[in-house]
């Protein structure tokens, strides 16, 4: 995941903030054209900060799971340890 492919937006219904992808994916028709341009923006900084904060908050749990060689590390961390992967409250990506 490239953080600078996302920007922070407000959900028009719930007013909650969420990260929305604005960059095309490799399989999209416009991808080759899009890659010809360089975009620099600080718009991804809130996502980077959010990810770093999650990692810092759950650092001990992350190391514990890695040490145990958990088979489904991502699922366990997301669902069991942090409870961050509940039902989505934001709009799906286009």
Curated annotation (Swiss-Prot):
Instruction: Detail the disulphide connectivity of this chain as listed in its UniProt entry.
Output: none
Q: Which domain of life is it from?
A: Eukaryota
The regions listed as transmembrane in this protein's record are: none
Q: Which family does it belong to?
A: Belongs to the canopy family.
- The name of this protein is Protein canopy homolog 1
Q: Which organism is it from?
A: Mus musculus (Mouse)
